[in-house]
């Protein structure tokens, strides 16, 4: 475990959580039970998605990103659907690269929209974000407010974290 962390890799311990590299302390541990956040993106936006993954993890969330979580030999369509279904939030990263592109990104969005049908209407599940000045698909834009991560990345991330935390607080209050 230590060697992997020193090499800059995260190490997931089933049933417990994830050890992650940390520049200040060497590593940090994220226990299971943290709110799960699925990140959907196109491969051209992988660097931005990885930055968002890091920001969410640093804020105490457990992000899910295919490049970080899929295992060799794993059935990736099934793993992705399971991850979306188990997530507390689904962040769709739209950009000029994703506009009109066919493939896995679109399938993930469609599956998330199906999952959202099972969630109470006033709960937030899908959080669309724009990585650049692109068009958000009409079906999404007509129903769900998006957040811009440009030109001020930090401000956009703070807005995402704020809305997710308010939702989690509301869900906890509703259970008690």
Language-model segments: which ranges?
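Extended, charge-enriched "interface" segments that sit outside catalytic cores
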Residues: 129
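Short, polar/flexible loop-turn hinges at active-site or ligand-entry regions and domain interfaces
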Residues: 99-100, 119, 147-151
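Conserved N-terminal substructure of TIR/SEFIR domains
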Residues: 34-93, 97, 113, 117-125, ...
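Glycine/threonine-rich flexible loop motifs
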Residues: 100-107
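Output/docking surface of receiver
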Residues: 143-160
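Strongly charged
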Residues: 1-35
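Glycine-rich, charge-decorated loop segments at or immediately adjacent to ligand/cofactor-binding or catalytic sites
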Residues: 133-144
């Amino acid at each position: 475990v230590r060697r992997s962390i020193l090499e800059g890799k995260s190490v997931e311990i089933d049933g417990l959580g994830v050890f992650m590299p940390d520049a200040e302390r060497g590593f940090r541990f994220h226990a299971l039970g943290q709110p799960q956040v699925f990140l959907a993106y196109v491969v051209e936006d992988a660097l931005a998605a990885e930055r968002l993954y890091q920001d969410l993890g640093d804020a105490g969330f457990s992000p899910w990103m295919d490049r970080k979580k899929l295992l060799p030999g794993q059935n990736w369509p099934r793993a992705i659907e399971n991850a979306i279904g188990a997530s507390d939030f689904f962040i769709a990263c739209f950009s000029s690269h994703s506009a009109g592109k066919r493939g896995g990104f679109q399938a993930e969005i469609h599956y998330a929209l199906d999952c959202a049908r099972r969630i109470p209407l006033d709960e937030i599940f899908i959080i669309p974000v724009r990585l650049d000045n692109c068009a958000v698909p009409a079906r999404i834009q007509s129903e769900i407010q998006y957040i811009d991560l440009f030109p001020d990345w930090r401000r956009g991330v703070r807005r995402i974290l704020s809305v997710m935390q308010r939702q989690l607080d509301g869900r906890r209050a509703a259970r008690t």
